[in-house]
A protein has these predicted regions:
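N-terminal helical capping/dimerization or prosegment-like subdomains
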Residues: 1-73, 236-240, 254-257, 331-342
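Short glycine/proline-enriched coil/turn segments at helix->beta-strand junctions
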Residues: 5, 35-39, 44-46, 58-59, ...
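Predominant activation on well-ordered alpha-helical scaffold segments within soluble catalytic domains
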Residues: 11, 31, 104-107, 111, ...
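Generic recognition of short, well-ordered alpha-helical segments
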Residues: 25, 104, 137-138, 186, ...
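Active-site metal-coordination/substrate-binding segment of hydrolases
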Residues: 59-124
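Hydrophobic/aromatic beta-strand patches that form the interior of the parallel beta-sheet core
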Residues: 62-64, 126, 151-153, 312-314
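Acidic/histidine-rich catalytic neighborhood of metal-dependent amide-processing enzymes
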Residues: 99, 103-171, 175, 211, ...
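Metal-dependent amide/peptide-bond hydrolase catalytic core
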Residues: 164, 173-355
Length: 355
């Protein structure tokens, strides 16, 4: 069997347009690789997944997951986003860093373990859709169709460090209500002033529960809209708040605290993108310590938020490069990733056997 080449696989992936909801051609590439290695797989919409050959339902099952979709290229690109171009140790192309590098190296890791007998765990590899838009037909659709998952490694660019916690997200649509009047008459109730009081609360309130990994809950007002003309006191003021929730709160808990402290109407677009974290005694913490891998809390969102199991985030590449013009990943990052994943899973297997 031809050895798996992650650089070649990623180059092929880059050359395929795979925007959210348009992942089928990229999914077909993963299908062709699994077919080459004679591995059975299941297709669910634009998602594809496979189990290790000697799957045993009595064992713990670990999910290896990353996403097929990319954002659309921005106007700052100077290179063809769909042409995999190597230069000075870098592989350029849309999705190379977020998260094609993680996807192909997790696939390579799965191929390494697939045929092994007597693994101390099961492995499921899943290439999922719609991560970039937190869509309904990606991991949210797929997870219930997988075997029971005990733990997940989600492939995202982390410099191959391990993110042991991740902030959740809520977007709030807020509306302050006033009473319109002629601006010259010093009458009415100015909805903008009403909104300012609540906006000041959003900017200054500190949630009491702090996290060692993800810090505090952050609330940022990102949009404000009010008024129709210069001489009318506005009766409504709409504003949007971006809320990043640490792993000490659920989204609903934070939403209830907000509603009890502000006067404006508050509506959450969604409460499903919760924070994630692992228990203080989880074996992956011991693995990271033994392998001298840095751990941290991530402020950015991934499909972890849609997984009702403990999970970490780990992968080649740098989150700072995600969604940037002329996106790239270092080739040596790809070369280091599979051995690092293998070491983590091997050590994790030893810890599971001890526990």
């Amino acid at each position: 069997m031809i050895p798996f080449n992650p650089v070649e696989a990623l180059s092929n992936l880059i050359s395929i347009r795979s925007f959210s909801k348009e992942e089928e051609p990229a999914r077909n590439l993963i299908e062709s690789i699994l077919t080459t290695y004679e591995i059975s797989f299941t297709i669910d919409l634009n998602n594809i997944w496979a189990k290790n050959k000697h799957f045993d339902s009595s064992k713990h099952t670990i999910l290896l997951n990353s996403h097929l979709d990319t954002v659309k290229p921005n106007k700052g690109y100077t290179k063809d986003p769909f042409y995999p171009h190597s230069e000075n140790g870098k592989l350029y192309g849309l999705g190379s860093n977020d998260a094609g590098g993680a996807l192909v190296t997790l696939l390579g890791t799965f191929l390494h373990f697939h045929n092994e007998k007597d693994l101390p765990f099961n492995l499921v590899f899943a290439a999922s859709a719609e991560e970039e838009i937190s869509g309904k037909n990606g991991m949210e659709f797929l997870f219930s169709r997988l075997p029971k998952i005990d733990f997940a490694i989600v492939g995202e660019p982390t410099l191959l460090d391990i993110a042991i916690a991740e902030k959740g997200l809520m977007v709030l649509d807020c509306k302050s209500i006033g009473k319109s009047a002629h601006a010259a008459r010093n009458e009415g109730v100015n909805a903008i002033y009403e909104a300012i009081n609540d906006i000041n609360w959003f900017s200054s309130y500190v949630f009491p529960k702090q996290s060692d990994e993800t810090g505090t809950v952050n609330m940022t007002v990102t949009q404000v809209k009010s008024g129709s003309q210069h001489n009318v006191v506005p009766s409504e003021c709409d504003f949007v708040v971006d809320v990043r929730i640490n792993d000490k709160y659920s989204n609903n808990e934070v939403l209830n605290i907000i509603k009890s402290n502000v006067k404006c109407e508050v509506s959450a677009r969604s409460t499903r993108l919760n924070s994630s974290g692992i228990s203080s005694n989880h074996p992956i913490r011991i693995v990271a310590e033994k392998l001298n891998i840095n751990t941290y809390g991530s402020p950015t969102l991934s499909d972890q938020s849609l997984m009702p199991c403990e999970s970490v985030k780990m992968g080649p590449g740098d989150s700072a490069r995600s969604h940037t013009a002329d996106e790239f990943i270092y080739i040596d990052e790809l070369e280091q990733a599979i051995p690092k994943y293998i070491a983590v899973l091997t050590q994790l297997g030893e810890e599971l056997m001890v526990s």
